[in-house]
Structure formats: structure tokens, C-alpha cells
């Protein structure tokens, strides 16, 4: 899944929509931006951690975002629904959640940033010593099978298989524009990510 910029198509054209994280700092978006509180959503915590750890952004970026009137919602669904309802023109949003709402008729668009796209991995694995290891292996194999990956694509997620047709951006396209993120550092600094963000926004 990928974190980019979603927008209400009734209020913002594709041409007008922000194309970078820095575009959200433009005064024309003042008080028209929403994102999910990272203390309530792991995907947003990942996004915040990725930008905090990048010297191009860091804490200063979030200070500027706050100064431009970015508001917080308590959950991912609420963030997307608020943009769909027109309460905000743009939001820091997830591609698959946005696309699911588009499929339901919501007036939304989504920008895959050409650089510094925050791509979030969704790993699967077996817990060592689990009670039903054989069943776990069957599920693991099914998820990675062509049929299993086609189900993910039907739900607007990306497949890791080359023989499954994607609905939107390809894995190769996303890889080219994705930000490099140190996953171990994010895990090690999870509490610090939230405390730094909260010191700016709350």
C-alpha cells in the first residue's frame, strides 16, 4: 500500500492537486488539509517516521504543515471520508482506501507522488512455535499464490507476482518513486516518532 495525496475531485482538479509533500505547504491549501493521527494508525506512523528520518523533511516539515492548518482525524477511515465529503480539499491518504471509496462512487482522486512516495510493506509470516503451523503454511502459500494475489488486487492492493495484472500503478513504477526507509530504525524509534509529532501538533 502507498501513502500519497488524495483530493476531492469536486473541489480540486487533477492538474491543481498537490504533486509533492512540499506542495502541501503552499498557502493555497491553508486549512484544507487533513491527515490521520499517527498514534491511531500504523500506516500514518510509518509515513511520519519516514519523513522525520529524511533530512529533506524532518521535524521542520511537520511544523510547516501544522502552520498551514493541517488537521488530524482519529482514524484512517475518517480521514478519507472527510475528504470525500468535502470537509477538506486534500488529505495525506492511502491509495487502496481511496480507490475503494472511488469504486463506491466517492468524488476522490489520488496522486502517486513522482518522488518520495511512501510505500508501506505488508509482510506475512508464521509465528515460531505456533499451534497450527501446517494450516498457517497453507494460508501463507494461498496468499502468495496467483489466486490469492488476484484477490488482493480486486481489493485495490498491489500484487508481488509478475503474472497478476495490477489495477493501478505497477510495483516497478512505485519502486522507482518510493522513498528509501530504514524499517529497523522506524521500529526502534516508534515511541520517539509519536512524541516528536505530538510536540508539534498537540
Predicted regions span which residues?
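Extracytoplasmic ligand-binding site segments that recognize negatively charged/polar headgroups
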Residues: 1-87
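A ligand-binding cleft/hinge motif common to bilobed small-molecule-binding domains
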Residues: 89-107, 156
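Solvent-exposed loop/turn segments at secondary-structure junctions
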Residues: 11-13, 31, 39-42, 96-99, ...
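Periplasmic-binding protein-like
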Residues: 31-36, 63-66, 72-73, 104-128, 142-166
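An extracytoplasmic/periplasmic, membrane-proximal ligand-sensing/linker region
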Residues: 58-60, 160-202
Amino acid at each position: 500500500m502507498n501513502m500519497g495525496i488524495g483530493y476531492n475531485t469536486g473541489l480540486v482538479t487533477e492538474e491543481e492537486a498537490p504533486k509533492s509533500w512540499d506542495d502541501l505547504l503552499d498557502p493555497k491549501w491553508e486549512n484544507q488539509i487533513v491527515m490521520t493521527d499517527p498514534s491511531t494508525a500504523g500506516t500514518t506512523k510509518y509515513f511520519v517516521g519516514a519523513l522525520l528520518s529524511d533530512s529533506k523533511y524532518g521535524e521542520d516539515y511537520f511544523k510547516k504543515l501544522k502552520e498551514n492548518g493541517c488537521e488530524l482525524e482519529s482514524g484512517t477511515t475518517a480521514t478519507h471520508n472527510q475528504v470525500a465529503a468535502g470537509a477538506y480539499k486534500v488529505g495525506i491518504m492511502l491509495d487502496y482506501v481511496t480507490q475503494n471509496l472511488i469504486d463506491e462512487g466517492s468524488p476522490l482522486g489520488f496522486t502517486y507522488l513522482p518522488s518520495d512516495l511512501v510505500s508501506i510493506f505488508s509482510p506475512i509470516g508464521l509465528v515460531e512455535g505456533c499451534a497450527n503451523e501446517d494450516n498457517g503454511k497453507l494460508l501463507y502459500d494461498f496468499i502468495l499464490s496467483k489466486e490469492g494475489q488476484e484477490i488482493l488486487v480486486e481489493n485495490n492492493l498491489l500484487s508481488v507476482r509478475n503474472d497478476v495484472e495490477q489495477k493501478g500503478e505497477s510495483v516497478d513504477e512505485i519502486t522507482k518513486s518510493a522513498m528509501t526507509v530504514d524499517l529497523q530504525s522506524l521500529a526502534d524509534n516508534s515511541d520517539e516518532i509519536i512524541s516528536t509529532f505530538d510536540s508539534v501538533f498537540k
